[in-house]
Amino acid sequence: MTYQTFFLISDPDNLDYPIYIVYDKSRVLDYFGDIFYTQSTTITEIELGDTNPDFKISILHNNNYLTSHVIKSTKYSLLDVNTVQMLLDYKDPDYELKSTCHLYIFYMTKNRFDICDYLIASNIKYIDSFGNISLLNSTNLNNYQLIKYIIDNNEFFNCRYYYLMLGILRYTKFYDLVDYILELISKSNNHIDYNSLLMELFSKFDCMGSLINSEIDAFQIKKLIDGNYFDEKVLFDTVICNNFELTKYLVEKGFNYDFDTIINSNVKFDVLKYFIELGNYLTDDHIYMILCNTSCEYYEKIIYLVDNNHITEKYFTKSIISRIIHFEFYLLDYLTNKLNIIELIDLDLLMKTSIRCNETVMVKKCIDYGINPDEYMEFAIKHDICIAKKLMELGGNIPDNMCIYNPDAYLTIESIDIILENNYDSLENLLPKIINNCDSEIIMYIIKKLTDTTIIIPHGLIKIFIRSYYWGRGNDIYSGIINSNLNFDDYQQIIIGIMRKEYNKIEQLIFSSTYYNSIELLFVVTLSENIELFKLLLEINCNDNNYLSWAFVFSIGCFKLMKYIVDNYNIDIYQRQFEVCIMSLQNYYRCYNQSDQIKFYLLLMGYEISCFNNKKNYNENIPLVKFMREMGVTLV
């Protein structure tokens, strides 16, 4: 391997302990995805620094490697055609490239179509394992010259005109390119299913399942409509369900339509209103169909139809009213004010639904309609003290065998206030349940309640604080903690002090406490990435091998901590390899900027790449998994 030629695409971020990814000269063309990702426009020829005593090398993929030392030689510009020819010359004639999509995309996005021509002339095929998805994504399609180049060279790229049209119509306003494709199709044997194209244009998701963040350009669709590219029925059925502007355009052009079809299609409110205002007559069947279909802007439709006297009491049934209670509860208040439908209402269903929704207005209406509030007090108490209290104010009486306060009911900010103001329970007793519910809004509220009190903070709340610290310092709970004035005990003061970055105070607290060997405290210190506190804990616990092994596992979140413990303590880095790999994956989501370097370092030290991302390792008996679950941290 000493005499092989390798290339370096970019320098590593951490130059204090650099780990280089180097590429076999004969395979660089296969790795233009990495070049495209880094946006590097140069490539450096290197020799491996295998004369260095600390030299290490490990295979990363088939033809690229990780190494700790390189000797840089010559830098080449990737925008120079001579460099491209050099890479072509290095390629083994018998080797078939696995992927060249990013090779071509790299040069097209740089507007170096001359180099693309050179690659085509050199018989470098366009290869994309995902078809043409990489080529026809929304970013590339914003480049007019790039799309034009693909169209002009489509015999080489072999893109279906269907997907070219779809991408251009979906993401651009390059109208002349649509006309250009239509002209090319007319001169060839190619055919586009324009009806399928139209339906796919209105899809909210692309072929990879990603949400499409673009609006349909009605102008270009109108041109295709005028050119009679669509079947009239497919066109009308598709448009009325998706685009009001195009719906009006079709009607104004004189398209024949069936009003029954429009009603059956459960169109949006603006479309329904438009056709009614055109003078189309709503039959009884139409109205029943609208009333029974409680989706697609139902609330707006029913209010409009009632306000304009298209719907009266005669159209409602008990079944329809019950559906409204279930699916459009807040519509019922409007309907009962406008129409005489009380006899159709299942008052028991309405009362229970009103209690579940904490809707005092509807509860009062039910009582006005004859409901006995006493019969629903037990139901209300089990649900929420707030609505139970309101029911009492409306004349309800608590059963002799019950108390208005139900300790098992779900807590809200309003219910907590009622409980505390009426001395139904104490904040100390409520805290464990609040902690278990782990509602961030309620916890923030409780932090304010606890401020400047003498109430001792339970350890469960500290675990929530640590969890908020773990997932990111920009969240509300973390911000609330560091700005609060709570009654913390000695251990909690250490934890909170770390979060507040009061490191000078913390050292003395650790020395004078019995918590110096706490694994939980060690975890928080590694989250802080403070090297001095980390050194202090290691120094105090230097003879505890179990503690040191935990320190190594937790340090995987921060390269400088990990490197320190490896360099200064006799750690067996392979003893807990599964746990280290689990921690590495967690940190991929927490601190992506460090995760690759840590992973590469471990690979250089002999870790198997198959160990990473292997969720079969998440055995509950593994100490790290058990610890994280006790902390309430969900493993990803």
UniProtKB/Swiss-Prot annotation:
The keyword Aminoacyl-tRNA synthetase belongs to this UniProt entry's keyword annotation: no
Lineage: Viruses, Varidnaviria, Bamfordvirae, Nucleocytoviricota, Megaviricetes
Keywords: ANK repeat, Repeat
Sequence ranges of the ANK repeats: 63-97, 99-129, 130-159, 161-190, 230-259, 261-284, 322-355, 372-400, 425-455, 517-546, 548-575
Protein's UniProt keywords contain Repeat: yes
Protein name: Putative ankyrin repeat protein L766
